[in-house]
């Protein structure tokens, strides 16, 4: 916290230091070790997923693999931003890498977080097309289309994350503050997401990210999986066990999304609102005790909890979206549209049972189905 957003009076430096010291305690106590563990697991799981994709003999990759690779790359890059953040949060909270690295770390995390959401949405929509509209998918969707959509997704993520380069900055200690230590946190350099005088604009930006980077993709994912679920439930050729397996796979993906990205963005906006209210009142506080007592710890602690829990999604994505296990593809071959268009040769050529096998392009010399060849 740096200055009063009202512009009438500045917040006393000792009030700001006391507030920062109290709030930083939550990060130093639990957040940094969680980030270290998540980094190790996310790098191992997504690195393994990328390795498995790289040794696939079948080329070109069909859209399922293209989107899954983009998701693994975005998760891996996002995980690589966690070690410098953990080192920063480790007491004493001190940024040692310069202002350019501060801005870059914030940008890369936000960009790859948005990329992760975008490619999850692409996977969901591709599953929908492959199962509910298999004729269209097999006739029109090609790997080049998936690569083009992926490129557009990366550009969109970068554009949405670009403002973080402007908002992020270093807060340097006052001259003569001494050496940074646990006993002298006011002498440490802070890497901040935004200064208090920019909180109004930062709140608007956070709302845009919550809407375009979380809400809209969630609605598209829910719509795609809802239509897919209806197709599965109406399929007379599927057993109850197969339907339950599809339902579990879909529900787990939606639950992971709703329990990680959604609360993260909500708590981020609530935390910014709490910061604005405190900064506006700061010049009127009588003493340090009143200033620290006025801190709204609920939104802040909730946001820190989600900063620790949200990266767990990067660790779980390889299991949900990239693992070569029987999933929607093998179950939904009994779906009416899928059954008419599915070709056993597609399963052999893909070498995996990802739910999007139906989107693999048929060979020009082969009929799309027995019905079409008659």
Curated annotation (Swiss-Prot):
Main location: membrane
One family name in Pfam for this protein: 7tm_1
Residues on Cytoplasmic side: 51-64, 138-146, 228-245, 330-374
Transmembrane segments: 30-50, 65-85, 117-137, 147-167, 207-227, 246-266, 309-329
Stretches of the chain found on the membrane's Extracellular side: 1-29, 86-116, 168-206, 267-308
InterPro entries named among the record's database cross-references: GPCR_Rhodpsn (IPR000276), GPCR_Rhodpsn_7TM (IPR017452), P2Y11_rcpt (IPR027677)
Region of interest (Disordered), residue spans: 345-374
Glycosylated sites: 4, 179
Gene Ontology MF: a single term: neurotransmitter receptor activity
GO BP: activation of adenylate cyclase activity; calcium-mediated signaling; cellular response to ATP; defense response; G protein-coupled receptor signaling pathway; neuronal signal transduction; phospholipase C-activating G protein-coupled receptor signaling pathway
Topology relative to the membrane: Multi-pass membrane protein
Tissue expression remark: Highest expression in liver and spleen.
Keyword tags: Cell membrane, Disulfide bond, G-protein coupled receptor, Glycoprotein, Membrane, Receptor, Transducer, Transmembrane, Transmembrane helix
Source domain of life: Eukaryota
Membrane is among the record's keywords: yes
Disulphide bridges, residue numbers: 102-180
Stimuli inducing this protein: Increased by DMSO and retinoic acid.
A cellular component term, taken from the record's GO annotations: plasma membrane
Location of this chain's protein in the cell: Cell membrane
This protein's record includes keyword Cell division: no
Function per UniProt: Receptor for ATP and ADP coupled to G-proteins that activate both phosphatidylinositol-calcium and adenylyl cyclase second messenger systems. Not activated by UTP or UDP.
Further comment: A chimeric transcript, characterized by the first third of PPAN exon 12 joined to P2RY11 exon 2, has been detected. It is possibly produced by trans-splicing. The chimeric transcript is widely expressed and can be induced by retinoic acid during the granulocytic differentiation of the HL-60 cell line. The resulting chimeric protein shows a much lower activity than the non-chimeric P2RY11 gene product, but qualitatively indistinguishable.
PANTHER family: P2Y PURINOCEPTOR 11, PURINOCEPTOR-RELATED G-PROTEIN COUPLED RECEPTOR
Entry similarity comment: Belongs to the G-protein coupled receptor 1 family.
Name of the protein in its database record: P2Y purinoceptor 11
Protein species of origin: Homo sapiens
